Every structure is written in structure tokens, then in C-alpha cells.
Amino acid sequence: DHDRAPVDIRALFAFTKKNAGEAMEKLKETAGIHGCIILSTCNRLEIWASHEDDQELSLYQCLCQLKNIQDDSYESYFVSRTDREAAEHLFYLAGGLKSQILGEDQILTQIKDALNLAREHFTTDSILEVLFRMAVTAGKKIKTEAPLAHGNPSVIHQAVSHLKEQGYDMHGKICMVIGNGEMGKVAAQTLRDAGANVTVTVRQYRSG
């Protein structure tokens, strides 16, 4: 995640929505794995898997195979969690308590999207279903009851607020947002709401 790996390393292991679906299907074909979910955002890459109790499984090695990476030097950027530690991590994550901006809203949506994508590709199972649903419920409760979840605690909102505090007027400024994914759309809308003239560009052209 953003605490352990710089942005270039995170980009190396990131998945698009399409690639994540294909990767989950391949991962579930691994002997002993009952279900898997890939959570890939700009700030983190996590692979969740339920598997046989007595199975020795290296999700890092599985990830490297999926990415065609043959280099163990990246392993220090990853951490493995199991059982209660893994569940607690997901609950904290869903509440925005492990985000760059404490209490930010996007991660809860990203967790729900990851679960839905796994459902579409038939790679989740009862254990991951219950775990992720409980995490989403906990995340909603935190955002409803905790003061840190109020307002607009996303990175882009904080950036625009900081510019305003420094005396920069966004009205009429020409801004370019690279990427039209979820965060790109949030960035474009936030800048537009602040009065900027916004252009959005994508890295790849896809017809149809």
C-alpha cells in the first residue's frame, strides 16, 4: 500500500478492472483456493483468498506469476495477514482508517466494487462474502458515527482546499485530469465545482 511502496512499485502491480477479473479466475484455479478477491486502487493492491487450512500458499508468488514478474526483490513491499489479523485489517480499511486521508470515502466504494467484480467472475465464496459484507457494514457505521468521516476527506478535496487556503483561485484555471477512472472522475468534478476549466484525457484509446 501507500505506506510500504512508492507509486512506481504500486503501478507495477496494479490491475485494471478487466485484468483483475481475469487474474481472479486464474487464481481460483490454483489447487486448494476456494475463493479470491483482488482489491486494486491507486494506493494499494491486495489479494484476498480463502484456502485449505493445511495449505502453504504464497500469494506474492501467485501475484508475480499473474504479472509475469520474476524478481523476488519486490517481496519486501508486501505483507501477509491471516485469520483475525486479516479480518481486522479489512475492517479498518473499510472505515478509511488506513487511508492517506483519514476517513476518506472512496475506499469503501472500492471494496464493494472489488466484491461485486469477484461475484461477476464467480471467484468469491461464502467466507469472503461474509467477511467483505461485514467489513462494508462496519465501514458504513464508522462513517456515520465517527467525526473523522464528516466532510469531504478525499485526497483531491484536500488538495483543492489547501490551494484555496494558500490564496489560489481556481476559477478559470485550465486543469487536465489524466485518467477517467473513479478517482479521475472525482478529481474532474471537484476541480469543476471549484470553477476550473477541466479537460480529461485517457492513457489508452479503446474503440467501441
Model-derived regions: residue spans:
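A glycine-rich (often HGG/GG-containing) alpha/beta subdomain
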Residues: D1-S99
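Conserved short-loop catalytic and cofactor-binding motifs
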Residues: A11, P147, A196
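Alpha-helix N-cap/helix-start and coil->helix boundary motif
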Residues: R44, R84, L108, Y205-R206
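Glycine/serine-rich phosphate-binding loop and adjoining beta1-alpha1 elements at the start
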Residues: S73-M170
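Glycine-rich phosphate/diphosphate-binding loop of Rossmann-like nucleotide-binding domains
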Residues: K164-G208
